[in-house]
């Protein structure tokens, strides 16, 4: 039976239903337990990073190689025809799509990945982050990590801390967890970096509980997941960045009242928002979370590029 993600564009987490998410996570678990080094051996995948990235690019490209795919692409658009000669994004994608079986793309402009789908023909586009909008594959690895550590994706208490305005990871993760039952959200951010109203409206429409808080201390005893984010210097003016960057910092001493199995997650890179003394606690799980990116992205690539996937 053909899988529902075959040749599907993955631009927003909302392109995936709850059943789709469960399929990706189940596939990720199978690939983690049983590697498939030749699954994509006849595929060529473009890795097109128009914006700087370390973890996402290396994670995606490692995933491609470990499934046996050939990888082409770039990590600096300044050295492409788009950057040097003024070629349009539409023309760039139109040409690349004639070479490859799938395109993984990061771009600083919101909506760029969706635009790319209009020019990629039958070649699926996977969004690796578009401005402050969406980061669906980060959400997949977040969900995989939450499911591994908590044993479920429903009836969770989840706190999100830091830059909730520009942090595309928290937008995608909130939308994804809203597809499951009984989850409750705690948003902890300075006013200038509050969760966008459209996310709050979505939660209200679904009847999902959420609340705003001014400190981690207010909620630490209640939560199963504490999702930290950095204040994104590249998206703020210098004076605003200086005012808010140190407002929410997690230290080991803040975790004394946490549940025994509460996990601290972070999409990385961190700057000052998680003190290094947290690393030694059993709550710190952000490096394992990053490692899970390999399996979540392998799962998505495998499903998008195989009509009938049997593992």
UniProtKB/Swiss-Prot annotation:
Q: Name one GO biological process term.
A: 'de novo' pyrimidine nucleobase biosynthetic process
Q: Does the keyword Heme apply?
A: no
For binding carbamoyl phosphate, which residues are annotated in this chain's numbering?
55-56, 106, 135, 138, 268-269
Positions bound to L-aspartate: 85, 168, 230
Q: In which pathway does it act?
A: Pyrimidine metabolism; UMP biosynthesis via de novo pathway; (S)-dihydroorotate from bicarbonate: step 2/3
Q: What class of enzyme is it?
A: transferase
* A Gene Ontology term for the protein's cellular component: cytosol
Query: What is this enzyme's catalytic activity, as reactions?
Result: carbamoyl phosphate + L-aspartate = N-carbamoyl-L-aspartate + phosphate + H(+)
> Sorted alphabetically, which Gene3D superfamilies does this protein's record hold?
Aspartate/ornithine carbamoyltransferase
MF (Gene Ontology) = amino acid binding; aspartate carbamoyltransferase activity
Q: Name one Pfam family in it.
A: OTCace
Q: Name the Enzyme Commission number(s) assigned to this protein.
A: 2.1.3.2
Alphabetically ordered keywords of this record: Pyrimidine biosynthesis, Transferase
Matches recorded under PROSITE patterns: CARBAMOYLTRANSFERASE
Name the job this protein performs. Catalyzes the condensation of carbamoyl phosphate and aspartate to form carbamoyl aspartate and inorganic phosphate, the committed step in the de novo pyrimidine nucleotide biosynthesis pathway.
| Oligomeric and partner information | Heterododecamer (2C3:3R2) of six catalytic PyrB chains organized as two trimers (C3), and six regulatory PyrI chains organized as three dimers (R2).
PANTHER family with a match to the protein in the record: ASPARTATE CARBAMOYLTRANSFERASE (PTHR45753:SF6), ORNITHINE CARBAMOYLTRANSFERASE, MITOCHONDRIAL (PTHR45753)
Protein's name according to its UniProt entry = Aspartate carbamoyltransferase catalytic subunit
Source gene?
A: pyrB
